[in-house]
Curated annotation (Swiss-Prot):
The keyword Magnesium applies. It comes from Campylobacter lari (strain RM2100 / D67 / ATCC BAA-1060). GO terms for molecular function: crossover junction DNA endonuclease activity; DNA binding; magnesium ion binding. This is Crossover junction endodeoxyribonuclease RuvC. It catalyses: Endonucleolytic cleavage at a junction such as a reciprocal single-stranded crossover between two homologous DNA duplexes (Holliday junction).
Amino acid sequence: MKVLGIDPGSRYCGYAIVEKINNKNQLIEAGLIKIKPNDLQYQITELCEGLDLIFKNHQFDEVAIEDIFFAYNPKTVLKLAQFRGALSLKILQMHGEFAEYTPLQVKKTVTGKAKATKEQVAFMVKRLLGISKDIKPLDITDAIAVALTHSANLRVKK
């Protein structure tokens, strides 16, 4: 079972492909779609082109994305919502349905604490996957955590 986990953002979109083999999760690939500062329409185009490459180079059984977090700046919320809409449409076109998780759900699943820090999430991601070296930036570990959360929820549903 291969899961694509996505952590959307306005500068970087983290992605991770995790495969469950014999009840053990393995990291297949993880990285970033870098979104250059530009007009919003060009940023959305960069995001969609980055997703196109991921979908063309890999096949997945499931896709999961992290819901946008609450931000105090209304402009940031609007921008993230527009990225999220474009991301959702692209996933629906390329794959079909997808799962969504709040940051609190992801943190709770991976660390056991809904209020865990990004560093605690990164530590547990490495531990759960048996990875010794640091994974940077944290957008990538967040995407891995989303994939692990969905993988765990699939196990519970079956």
